[in-house]
Regions:
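Bacterial N-terminal signal peptides that target proteins for export
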Residues: 2-14
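N-terminal secretory/targeting leader peptides
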Residues: 9-12, 27-129, 145-356
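Short, low-complexity interaction segments enriched in Ser/Thr/Pro/Gly
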Residues: 1-2, 33
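Active-site-proximal, glycine-rich beta->alpha crossover segments in alpha/beta enzymes
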Residues: 133-134
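Bacterial N-terminal signal peptides
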Residues: 12-24
């Protein structure tokens, strides 16, 4: 009986202490201030937030969680921040941007992106499956399309790739720029529309879910889009031709500003790189089996006979015709972009001479 009373008394004392500590009597237990993220990285992509919904849960959120909350990533997507595609070049050059998703890591028809390559960025490398395919002897014409590919040229690669594609003209075989004259092409941006004009073609805004019908009915002759998108969308069945044209070849990769990375503590640098490395196969699987389609590489192999590469001399001519456009775009975004483009052109010239 006495033992029960003693236990009851002890229980009451403990309960009373808990009440006091939880503030039920108007007292509050001393608490440490909420830990705020000590470091912040600003991320941007030239696409609306809904375009790549996998990005935050499969990558950005994983990095933040792995850092134990010490790192915050401010996610600004196209349409939600004030920077148009080429203007992001200026933002990056001023060091106001730490991370970005870059579409087309090689020579780009939207030439201001090329300026990013001359800045201190750590860029992603190629997906193993794609490069194995391009190295296949039977795919020499496809491999030649990557005649100026980033892995060879910039020597700054080796991290990650979260998707991959080759850009070109779906529905059209282009042996000469004359083959594009009069063609009605689906174009995803006004930059590409302007580029098509210089070769006598016209660009049209056709929603992705209407492209099959538009191609089949002749409303459009082709589409400026990625090979992966073209095939996985079933568009080969509507217009079974594709010409890879390196006006926008390459990869969709995560880009991290080297300077931003260097400012972080060594352990956080390691956490970012390790998390990206761990998530790379997860995201790649997501692309191949979900975001794009199953049997991606099988599809490319199956349609091998319809895939051709634009000859480098034709590409060079195309680029030469587009140079005035690129100069205009550089002027639109101000002197910083123009200066970077000048440095890039000089780098490009020296690199080309070193390969002769």
């Amino acid at each position: 009986m006495k033992r029960n009373k003693r236990l009851f008394f002890i229980t009451e004392v403990i309960a009373l202490l808990l009440i006091v500590l939880t503030g039920s009597f108007g007292f509050t237990a001393p608490t440490s201030p909420a830990q705020k993220p000590a470091y912040k990285l600003i991320f941007a992509e030239a696409a609306p937030r809904g375009v790549n919904p996998w990005l935050a849960p499969l990558l950005l959120d994983k990095i933040v969680k792995a850092s134990g909350g010490r790192l915050q990533i401010q996610d600004m997507r196209g349409g939600e921040h004030p920077y148009a595609l080429p203007e992001m070049l200026v933002v990056c050059s001023k060091g106001s941007l730490d991370m970005a998703i870059i579409h087309g890591l090689s020579q780009s028809g939207t030439e201001p992106w090329l300026g990013l390559m001359d800045l201190p960025f750590l860029l992603s490398g190629g997906a193993q499956e794609l490069w194995a395919l391009l190295n296949d002897p039977g795919f020499k014409d496809v491999r030649d399309a990557a005649w100026d590919n980033p892995l060879n040229k910039w020597n700054q690669f080796g991290l990650l790739t979260f998707g991959y594609t080759e850009y070109g003209f779906g529905g059209v075989l282009v042996n000469d720029l004359k083959d594009l004259k009069g063609k009605k092409m689906r174009a995803s941006s006004h930059w590409i529309v302007e580029m098509l004009k210089v070769v006598g073609a016209s660009g049209h805004n056709v929603p992705m879910n209407e492209m099959f019908t538009a191609l089949k009915s002749g409303v459009i002759d082709g589409a400026c889009t990625g090979l992966v998108t073209y095939q996985s969308g079933g568009l080969m069945e509507a217009a079974p031709y594709y010409t890879i044209a390196p006006y926008e070849p390459g990869l969709i990769g995560l880009t991290i500003n080297k300077n931003s990375l260097a400012k972080l503590p060594k352990d956080l640098q390691g956490i970012i790189l390790k998390t990206c490395a761990l998530q790379e196969p997860v995201v790649r699987e997501h692309f191949q089996t979900g975001y794009l389609s199953k049997g991606l590489m099988d599809s490319i192999l199956k349609n091998y006979g319809t895939v051709r590469a634009m000859h480098p001399s034709v590409v060079a001519n195309f680029r030469k015709l587009c140079e005035p456009l690129w100069d205009q775009w550089a002027q639109q975004v101000g002197p910083p972009a123009g200066e970077v483009l000048k440095r890039v052109k000089e780098f490009d010239r020296k690199w080309s001479e070193s390969k002769k």
